[in-house]
Amino acid sequence: QSPINIVSYDAKFRQRLPKLKFKPHMEKLKTEVTNHQNRAPEFEPEDGENLYVKLNNLVDGHYKFHNLHVHNGRTRRKGSEHSVNGRFTPMEAHLVFHHDDQTHFEPTRTKLGGAFPGHNDFVVVGVFLEVGDDGFGDEPDDEECKRILKGHHPDNNENGNGDNGNNGYNGDNGNNGDNGNNGYNGDNGNNGDNGNNGYNGDNGNNGDNGNNGENGNNGENGNNGENGNNGENGHKHGCRVKKAKHLSTILECAYRNDKVREFKKVGEEEGLDVHLTPEMPLPPLKNRHYYTYEGSLTTPPCTESVLWVVQKCHVQVSRRVLHALRNVEGY
């Protein structure tokens, strides 16, 4: 049964596990917000919005995006559902994909090392979410939230610069960043935070401090792996916590919406026009190392037909997201 405590030093390293990808890549989905079974508001795609996860050689069949939702707990220290070596994070995001029975592919259940009877109806991607204050800007006001919940981010157009013709927060294929220089970049960005080579996008170059950080050779502390040496099991899998600024703003506004905040019963919904991509809550592409196991849904009926893909690298959202989610009345 899921969730589980992942013991990293007992995990078996597999060099050939597939990369986590989506088809079509970077597709923006129109979603509406509904009340999840455990009263966690979830973002479900509108009819006609199709997006699939690709995990070749791990699962067969087509798995279609079903929803995004976020879990938190009674305390900040134990908010995530999964844990690694007994350590939790304040929240955990789940990207849920359901087998598309409209295709001609039957779902299979493939255990590492061989197949066994049964099948996976779901693929769920779990992401550990940390919270922070720095780098997320001012709280969005009501007018800004109205624009965001209609599918338009005020500082984001898909391929270019931010408001007023300057270089603001950029979209998926942006270049320059926050201060009109090279700041926070999109997935295919170049330079990073301080106008130099800082935080890069998926196809960027240098890491945190203009040296070899996230997408360079070395890990978090300028050396190899998580703790300045070689990472878990001796493999060089360094992580740097990505700040999910755009996602934070969307979640803040959605959870603050009057109707969403007053969700009490399962099945309640609010037709907010929110544009999301599955990339938003995920680490950059080159840092999507993951643990995978076969388990169950974490809410009733707790069906044991889920392939879990739990991201090793964490993502940070604004602390305001945590407070807003806790203020949803029925949660």
Swiss-Prot record:
Pfam families assigned to the protein according to its UniProt record, in alphabetical order: Carb_anhydrase, Collagen
Binding site for Zn(2+): H69, H71, H94
InterPro entries from the UniProt entry: CA_dom, CA_dom_sf, Carbonic_anhydrase_a-class, Collagen
UniProt-listed CDD domains: alpha_CA (cd00326)
Cofactor(s) required, per the database record: Zn(2+)
GO molecular function, one term: zinc ion binding
Tissue specificity as recorded in UniProt: Expressed in the mantle.
Ranges for region Disordered: 138-240
Keywords: Calcium, Disulfide bond, Extracellular matrix, Lyase, Metal-binding, Repeat, Secreted, Zinc
Biased composition (Basic and acidic residues): 144-156
Gene3D superfamilies per UniProt: Alpha carbonic anhydrase
Enzyme's top EC category: lyase
Primary localization class, coarse: secreted
Residues annotated for substrate binding in this entry: T298, T299
Region 24 X 3 AA approximate tandem repeats of G-X-N, residue ranges: 162-233
Sequence repeats: from-to residues: 162-164, 165-167, 168-170, 171-173, 174-176, 177-179, 180-182, 183-185, 186-188, 189-191, 192-194, 195-197, 198-200, 201-203, 204-206, 207-209, 210-212, 213-215, 216-218, 219-221, 222-224, 225-227, 228-229, 231-233
Listed GO CC annotations: cytoplasm; extracellular region
Ranges of Low complexity composition bias in the record: 157-232
Localization, UniProt: Secreted, Extracellular space, Extracellular matrix
Occurrences of domain Alpha-carbonic anhydrase (ranges): 1-331
PANTHER family cross-referenced by the UniProt entry: CARBONIC ANHYDRASE
Stated role: Acts as a negative regulator for calcification in the shells of mollusks. May function both as a calcium concentrator and as a carbonic anhydrase required for production of carbonate ions, which are assembled to CaCO(3) at mineralization sites. Is important for shell formation in both the calcitic prismatic layer and the aragonitic nacreous layer. Shows inhibitory activity of crystal formation when present in free state but, when attached to the insoluble matrix, may regulate the form and size of aragonite crystal.
Family from the record: Belongs to the alpha-carbonic anhydrase family.
Domain notes: The Gly-Xaa-Asn repeat domain binds calcium.
Quaternary structure, from the entry: Homooligomer; disulfide-linked. May also be disulfide-linked to insoluble organic matrix.
Protein name: Nacrein-like protein P1
UniProt organism field: Mizuhopecten yessoensis
Biological classification of the source: Eukaryota, Metazoa, Spiralia, Lophotrochozoa, Mollusca
